[in-house]
Every structure is written in C-alpha cells, then in structure tokens.
C-alpha cells in the first residue's frame, strides 16, 4: 500500500479516510502501519486479555502532537480487514493522557454510503452510553500490565472538537513536509 496516494478524505474534516490497523474485536495485538513502506508491523502484544472495542486506525496525511498520524476509533458492528481504507464521519474525540503525554483519539462512524446503521449519530452523545463506556474502559486499562505505562481518561469532546483535531493534524503534517 502506498499511503502517499491515499487522500485525507472526500471532505475533511467532516468526511475522512481511515486506514485500519486493528479490526474490531481483534486479538490483543497492537499493529502499526509503517508510513514509509506501507507494511503492517506488530508494534507489541498487549499484556491484558482485552479485545479492541472498535475498528482502529489513522487519518493519512495528518500529524498529531505525539508524532504519529491522528488516531481514529471507528465504531461499528463488523470487523474490517487490516489495511482497509474506511470512509468515516468523525463524531467526537476522546481526550487521554498517558506516559508519553496527551493523546487524542477521534471517534467516528462509517460513512452512510458504506453502512447507514449510524446515520442518526452526529455527535458522540448520540451513541449508546454503554458503547462509550466500553471504549473508555478499554483505553483506560489496555496498558495496565505493561511496566511503566499508564493511561488517564480526560473526557469526551464533540464533533466540532474532533474536526479541530483533524484540521490541526492536516496543518501539522503539511508544515512538517515543508521542513
């Protein structure tokens, strides 16, 4: 896969592409796409016996404060193959902090052209509360057994905050490419 040829999305930040690194309900393995080669690498095995509560990946051509592309959790009912590009509507952002600093994860739903199941979801609060609690629980505890690692959930932000995170990520990547 040549990530350089995959656009940010049809109408960013409201409609973005997400390259899936980890499918919904995946085994406890953290995968990451190498941005240069496009190859999928095993980043690490999670020490906790937990499964990902959503399809998980990143928006191409973005750069977040942690030096990686903007992370995205895509809720759904169907696991998506690793390396797939999924058209996504951002509906919120989960603010977190870990041993490396502040970390933001966009919450999205599949675009209605892919799957109309979430057409009524425009903001994170439109999802069932149990869905949000499952996501929070996973990210609050998935590093629990890893030496020196920790996570603190800071709270949720709305879709406009998610759009802002994506816009900042696009601008940061553009500035980084100029250097």
From Swiss-Prot:
Belongs to the PPase family. It comes from Rhodospirillum rubrum (strain ATCC 11170 / ATH 1.1.1 / DSM 467 / LMG 4362 / NCIMB 8255 / S1). Substrate binds at residues 30, 44, 56, 142. The lineage of its organism: Bacteria, Pseudomonadati, Pseudomonadota, Alphaproteobacteria, Rhodospirillales. Homohexamer. One of its GO terms (molecular function) is magnesium ion binding. Its EC number is 3.6.1.1. It comes from the Bacteria. Its cofactor is Mg(2+). InterPro entries: Pyrophosphatase (IPR008162), Pyrophosphatase_sf (IPR036649). GO terms for cellular component: cytoplasm. It catalyses: diphosphate + H2O = 2 phosphate + H(+). The keyword Cell cycle does not apply. Coiled coil: none annotated. The keyword Magnesium applies. Catalyzes the hydrolysis of inorganic pyrophosphate (PPi) forming two phosphate ions. Mg(2+) 1 binds at residues 66, 71, 103. Its main location: cytoplasm. It is found in: Cytoplasm. GO terms for biological process: phosphate-containing compound metabolic process. This is Inorganic pyrophosphatase. Mg(2+) 2 binds at residue 71. Keywords: Cytoplasm, Hydrolase, Magnesium, Metal-binding. It is an enzyme of class 3 (hydrolase).
């Amino acid at each position: 896969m040549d990530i350089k040829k995959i656009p940010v999305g049809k109408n960013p930040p409201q409609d973005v592409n997400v390259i899936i690194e980890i499918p919904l309900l995946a085994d406890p393995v953290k995968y990451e796409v190498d941005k240069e080669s496009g190859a999928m690498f095993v980043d690490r095995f999670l020490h906790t016996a937990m499964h990902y509560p959503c399809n998980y990946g990143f928006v191409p051509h973005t750069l977040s404060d942690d030096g990686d592309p903007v992370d995205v959790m895509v809720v759904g009912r169907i696991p998506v193959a690793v390396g797939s590009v999924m058209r996504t509507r951002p509906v919120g952002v989960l603010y977190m902090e870990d041993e490396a600093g502040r970390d933001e994860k966009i919450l999205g739903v599949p675009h209605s052209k892919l799957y109309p199941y979430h057409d009524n979801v425009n903001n994170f609060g439109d999802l069932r509360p149990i869905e949000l609690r499952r996501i929070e629980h996973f990210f609050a505890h998935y590093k629990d057994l890893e030496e020196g690692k920790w996570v603190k959930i800071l709270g949720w932000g709305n879709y406009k905050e998610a759009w802002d995170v994506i816009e900042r990520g696009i601008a940061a990547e553009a500035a980084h490419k100029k250097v």
